[in-house]
Amino acid sequence: MPCEELEIVWKNIKAEARALADCEPMLASFYHATLLKHENLGSALSYMLANKLASPIMPAIAIREVVEEAYAADPEMIASAACDIQAVRTRDPAVDKYSTPLLYLKGFHALQAYRIGHWLWNKGRRALAIFLQNQVSVSFQVDIHPAAKIGRGIMLDHATGIVVGETAVIEDDVSILQSVTLGGTGKTSGDRHPKIREGVMIGAGAKILGNIEVGRGAKIGAGSVVLQPVPPHTTAAGVPARIVGKPGSDKPSMDMDQHFNGIHHTFEYGDGI
C-alpha cells in the first residue's frame, strides 16, 4: 500500500474516533487512549497490542517497547496493517468503519501480533517470538507460528480457532474464516504445511493438511478436509474435498461468496480431489 493510502486510512480512523467520542461520551476516554492521542497508526497499534498481550511476566510497557522497535526497523509492517484494515472494511458487511478492526477485532489483533513475532523470529530472537505466539493463543484463541509467511490484505474473520503451522505460506489478499487449520499430516519435520496463493477464500472450519498448494483464486468450502492440491480458480469442498466447480470471480477472497456458483450441493463422502 502506498504511503498516501496509509495516511488516508489513518485519517479516516481519527475522524471516526472523533465522531464516536461525540456520539458516546461514556467511551470518550477509551477513544482518546486508543486512537485520538496517537500521531500515527504505528503508535496506536503498539498501544493496542501491548495492552492486549500484557501479562505479569511481560507488562504492557515492555511489549510496547518491542513492538515499537520492530516498527522502527520495518515500517512496512504498519503499511501491511493498513492493508489488513482496508481488507476487513471492504469484505466484512458487519464492519462499516476503518476503526473497527483496530479497536475490536481479534483476528486483526492476532495478525498484527504475528507480524511482530515473525520479525523477532527472523532476527534470531526466537524465544520471545514463541512467547508472543503463546500470548496470542491465550488472548485471542488464534495460533500462528512466527515462522509462517503471511502477506498483506489478509482478513481473519471471527478468527477463533485458526491454526497456521510453521512452514505455511499465505499470500496477499486471502480471507480465512474461523476454525480453519493449515496443518501438517504427522510428525515429519521440514516443509510440511499448506501454501495458500493470492486471492483464496477458505470457509469456516476447513482443514488443509500437508505441504500442498491451494492455487490462486481458489475457494475452499466450509468444513472441508483438503488433502490434495487445489488447482487455481476452482472450488473444493467435502470430506475429503473434491472439485465441485469454479468461483464466480478471480479473487473469491474479495467477494466472500459462500455459494458454489449458485448451486446447492448435497455432499457425500467421495474420492477426494
Curated annotation (Swiss-Prot):
Q: Which organism is it from?
A: Salmonella typhimurium (strain LT2 / SGSC1412 / ATCC 700720)
Q: Does the keyword Cytoplasm apply?
A: yes
Activity regulation comment: Sensitive to feedback inhibition by L-cysteine.
The catalysed reaction is: L-serine + acetyl-CoA = O-acetyl-L-serine + CoA
User: Partners and quaternary state?
Assistant: Part of the cysteine synthase complex formed at a ratio of 1 copy of this protein and 2 copies of O-acetylserine sulfhydrylase (cysK). The complex reversibly dissociates in the presence of O-acetyl-L-serine in the absence of hydrogen sulfide.
Provide the protein name. Answer: Serine acetyltransferase
Q: Which GO molecular function terms does the record list?
A: serine O-acetyltransferase activity
Q: What GO biological process terms does the UniProt entry carry, in alphabetical order?
A: cysteine biosynthetic process from serine
Record's GO cellular component terms: cytosol
